[in-house]
Amino acid sequence: MSKPQNPVQMAVIGAAHGIKGELRVKTFTGEPMALADYGPLYARDGRAFQITDIRPANTVVVVRFKGISDRNAAEALAGTELFVDRSMLPDDGEEDEFYHADLVGLEVRDDTGTALGKVVAVHNFGGGDILDVTLAGRKGVLIPFTQAAVPDVSVAEGFVRVDPVAAGLVEDEDGDAPREEDFDPKGRPRGPRDAGGNR
């Protein structure tokens, strides 16, 4: 396969590990070891990387790529983002699940349809998925990816609709922020999937 036409980021190469060309790699797959299941991975410039060995190491995997046999060659790859074509990813058909790559770049609208900004990243710091949104004329904000805060997602039409009160962008009519008792942790069965799901 050549350079992906519809790329989805699967990993980013970190620091060299040892002196024999191994690298620490942060994966965005549901199961980190599944990174090797996708065949060649591609850098933005089209270079292909074939995994010849992979093993777990704390929060990353240690990978050996074909043709990378010493520390100097490995160090030169630090920071390289690795992609596969979207067609290589499983489509589980779950209506309320999305790949991070599906959400990044979507326009953010309020309940009236007014454009507020764009999704620039998706994070999960351990408490649930969060959309990183840049708003027109304001600094970026973090919006919880919950049913209350983000009631509608339309990847096909290129937008997410947020409830400004539930998203914490404005106070409600009484001047109150959203109440803790209004929080329903099961309110959104969906959530951004890491690339590749649990393949």
Swiss-Prot record:
Give the compositionally biased regions (Basic and acidic residues). Answer: 176-193
- GO biological process assignments: ribosomal small subunit biogenesis; rRNA processing
| Domain PRC barrel as annotated: residue spans | 95-168
Chief place of localization:
cytoplasm
Region described as Disordered: spans on this chain: 167-199
Keyword rRNA processing assigned to the entry: answer is yes
Q: A Gene Ontology CC term for this entry?
A: cytoplasm
Which UniProt keywords are given for this protein, alphabetically ordered? Answer: Chaperone, Cytoplasm, Ribosome biogenesis, rRNA processing
The set of disulfide-linked cysteines is none
Give the domain of life.
Bacteria
As for family, the record states:
Belongs to the RimM family.
Q: Which PANTHER family match?
A: RIBOSOME MATURATION FACTOR RIMM
What is the UniProt domain comment for this protein?
A: The PRC barrel domain binds ribosomal protein uS19.
Name it: Ribosome maturation factor RimM
Organism from which the protein derives: Mesorhizobium japonicum (strain LMG 29417 / CECT 9101 / MAFF 303099)
What broad taxonomic lineage does this protein's source fall under? Bacteria, Pseudomonadati, Pseudomonadota, Alphaproteobacteria, Hyphomicrobiales
